[in-house]
């Protein structure tokens, strides 16, 4: 290793880095992946996977609670072992993390445990990572370098973690269920953990500075989720900014700013979910003349940075901060390097998903965004209460909304809130890739009874041809 030179050195083994490395190896490149933490990065170990395991436990709890009332299945006293809930999520993360290491080795990618910094256009310096053995060399040389370091949790200035104050990372390990929790931020992380904690009986208050939950999402979707959360007993405070917090006895007193008027709430625990920062600091960007904007590494349409031999993908390069976007960018970047793909990447075709219940999914432009761009649109909207499968399984919350071009019916965007929304959105993603129209979607026969029929029905609604609503 000390004397070897790679075609590509990838810094970070998350969903962007490990996928890029494997694709590069398939394209006959000699590849090394450098990781300072665990194989799979944040997504597999501290994000997507363990959090979905927790949400599955929450859904199971809700199903058990409703078994008698909904299905006539009486159960005895429900006992919760919250430590096992957390342990199960860690097992899922550990299993997939080991799977990533296996895939890298299977594809002949060298995996190096080290803390990496860029020392030049073709050099990555290696240092011992925290808690890890010394790396096998002091540096790695590569024809090209790919930065895939991801992002980290954002905190308010001066805020210290511990004593019940957490980000999502700490929450994934916190094996004592708080009686009450204040969640600062009503984006994807805030919504998912809000649902999780309320399902297990915690008193949940979600605080959001913006006037709606899920800032940036379709307003109708956000309002539907707010109503669902309130119905479940979650207190949602939109238009409230965080000011300060202080420990008082067994609880935290959180002071908020509501249009200039102070307001306080008390909670045993506080979860900070106000976004993430790209992990580009202390990376040695200056050593290779790499420019960044607010921490995001600047890239062109080939994912190349301001240093011609160094590329960047995923959270460290640009929003949206999504694992599947990082993976897709990783594949695109190495294929462009190999000359088998043209530059360019369609960010509008990247779906965004939130895995609380009801689930939320979107792709493309919302109705408001399309109109702001001067696009004439037609909209088809179908509630799940008009869907036979949804009624049969008692999952009638939410709706499907398809936004299409007025003249040709080209699918501009879709927003879904409801059961399995995050699975249903894939049909629209494929449709956008194939430049499908609402007429084509609506006239494609969907199996009955399925939730996917709501996609067909919403497409028909956009054409003025809805049958079941």
What name fits each language-model region?
Residues 9-16, 22-37, 49, 53-60, ...:
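Flexible, glycine-rich terminal cap/loop adjacent to redox cofactors
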Residues 21, 25, 194, 198-199:
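Gly/Ala-rich phosphate-binding loop of Rossmann-like dinucleotide-binding domains
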Residues 9-11, 116, 139-150, 183-184, ...:
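Short hydrophobic core segments
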Residues 2-6, 22-29, 34-177, 205, ...:
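Glycine-rich flavin
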Residues 17, 190-191:
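N-terminal Rossmann-fold NAD(P) dinucleotide-binding loop
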Residues 2-14, 177-187:
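Beta1/beta-strand and adjacent pyrophosphate-binding region of the FAD-binding site
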Residues 162-177, 264-339:
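FAD-site-proximal beta/loop scaffold in flavoenzymes
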